[in-house]
Amino acid sequence: MELRRALVRAAVSRPGVLLAVSPGATRQRLAVEAELARRGWPCVSGPAEADLLVVVGDREGEDEGEGEGEGEESDWVSGLWHGIPAPKARVWVTDPERVADALERGLADLARGQYEEHHEHQQHQQHQQHQQHQQHQQHQQHGDTAPHSDHRGHDMHGGHHGHAGHDMGLVEGLPMADRADDRDGLRLDVLHVPLGPVLADWPAGLILRLTLQGDVVQEVTVEPVTTPPSPRPPFWDEPWLRATAGEHVSRGNAARRLCAAHLDSLGRFFAVTGWDDMAARTRYVRDRALAGGSAAELTSLVRPLIRRAQRSRTLRWLTTGLGTLPAEQARHRGVTGPALVADGDAYSRMLVWLDAVGRSAAACDVIEALDAAETVGPRGRLDTPAPPSRALLDSLPRLLEGTEFACARIIVASLDPDLDELTHAQAPWTVHSHG
């Protein structure tokens, strides 16, 4: 019992956090990630590992992060919550300035839940022992010599957690395989696997529905999460959109945002390749850029990151040849920005990011005004009828089909589409482009 209590205290002091980020909530996500890094709380990859669910984004009809409000949340948030084993807690972050308060509230709720679960467990044991005692007396009184039940029927809710009976294609919550001809005419199992919208190091709001034969991706459907249009500009594109609208924006501020955006993408890229230490270092530099670090400081921080990534033979071996997008095809699909400049595979796109990080870090202190005609954000041109991430999303099926499933997340991370761009309602640059 003392060991169990010690383990409970350890879990509460350093809870595993599952981040569920809505499109349009990049500013809040960055604030949450920075605070989690400061506290040393780990981000987990799925509900089974989580203690604390942190939902990031606007919540209509609710005050900022207060209360549960089951009726107000989306189905995917509700599904995540029910998939987390007790004891658990949940908070909603809508204000980047109140992240610390939200996490403290979640920690308090988690501790309270641990306490309540401990006492509920004791009460359940006492109730079960009382029932067994009564049944034993009844059996003796009636001369019943049949063996006692092993109480397997008491755990009838187990099927609910596995969603058994809710979907004939599921067994204990896992999709069953169909059969179909592969490209060689062989009959192989076909498995339908969804990725997203909530995964660690994954574009917020992106759902990919994959059809697999063996470990090879045969078909891909892209389904962004439906969210209401937002009047706020996408966080990463904000400096260029403000300049286009006639506001004064310094070139240094735009360079700082570009540097942080590419560091954010690189952090995801390193994480999905299994280079966790490099991902953490990259995110630290990203946070320093957003916190206003000088050009000298940022340059001194990014140089070793760039050298280390460029010299990594393992990283090159893992990512070379994945998701090749020649410039001609990229241009035909409307792709602009780093993916067009790279004219190649996932490794080439990473190199373009690294080069842009080095140049933008050195320009963070420039005070001259940003030219309103410079409408190229981190993902590409902002003066086109569709946002640049739309073209990146449209390119995903062709890049993923025929690849191994294990490579899919690396390819997605090497493009890193920003679904915030799809939620921006009637952006000024979009209207202007039709005029």
Per-segment meaning from a language model:
Residues 98, 109-435:
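Metal/cofactor-centered catalytic core regions of large enzymes
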Residues 1-5, 173-174:
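Short acidic/polar alpha-helix capping motifs at helix-coil junctions
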Residues 3-114:
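Cofactor-cradling patches in redox/metallo enzymes
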